[in-house]
Amino acid sequence: MSRAVAGPEIERLIQLLGRLPGLGPRSARRATLHLIKKRETLMAPLGLALQDVLGKIVECQVCGNVDVRDPCTVCTDIHRDSSVLVVVAEVADLWALERANAINAKYHVLGGVLSPLDGVGPDDLNLTKLVERVGAGGVNEVILALGATVDAQTTAHYVTDLLRETGVKVTRLAHGVPVGGELDHLDEGTLSAAIRARTAL
């Protein structure tokens, strides 16, 4: 066990930062030292921003996104194509698609994927509201952007069956060669998916 090198307040900050995704103990220490070094220009504004947003965060009752308003910024954007609904597993997926600026549609966050091994069943996901949104009319296409894992694909098939009676067009993201990727560096599953999802030029 390593000895403490700073007071309990700093050690607590290190431990809390270490709980963030992608930050282990070493990275948390480096981040803490960086915050301390930049305490006037980074740490203080970060602390204020965290305090400001803490009491305002809400889950959008329409799509499941997180924001400081409900309905969220995405749902209230009148410039979006509300006839297209992109279904994602997590809020992080919604944000990733928005960063890519790939589509100007509305979203629906399931809150995970079906995973029998982890005890996640249909009742644990935001599926009822999805069926209600599609059933209310106005949605012409549902794009399943759920990833390529076995659980994600199982979820995609389940959602497709669930929406079959609505008559809505259901599509999913193509899987395959990433932009800038070289074929000899890809696994067989990715190559097979790329061949199956090929398009005409």
UniProtKB/Swiss-Prot annotation:
Record-given protein name: Recombination protein RecR
Function of the protein: May play a role in DNA repair. It seems to be involved in an RecBC-independent recombinational process of DNA repair. It may act with RecF and RecO.
CDD domains: TOPRIM_recR
Gene3D superfamilies to which the protein is assigned, alphabetical: 3.40.1360.10, 6.10.250.240, RecR Domain 1
InterPro entries in UniProt: DNA_Rcmb_RecR, Rcmb_RecR, Rcmb_RecR_Znf, TOPRIM_dom, TOPRIM_RecR
NCBIfam families tied to this protein: recR (TIGR00615)
Keywords: DNA damage, DNA recombination, DNA repair, Metal-binding, Zinc, Zinc-finger
Keyword DNA repair: yes
Native species: Azorhizobium caulinodans (strain ATCC 43989 / DSM 5975 / JCM 20966 / LMG 6465 / NBRC 14845 / NCIMB 13405 / ORS 571)
PANTHER family: RECOMBINATION PROTEIN RECR
Pfam families hit by this protein: RecR_C (PF21175), RecR_HhH (PF21176), RecR_ZnF (PF02132), Toprim_4 (PF13662)
Boundaries of every Toprim domain copy: 83-178
GO terms for MF: DNA binding; zinc ion binding
Keyword Metal-binding: yes
Transmembrane annotation, as ranges: none
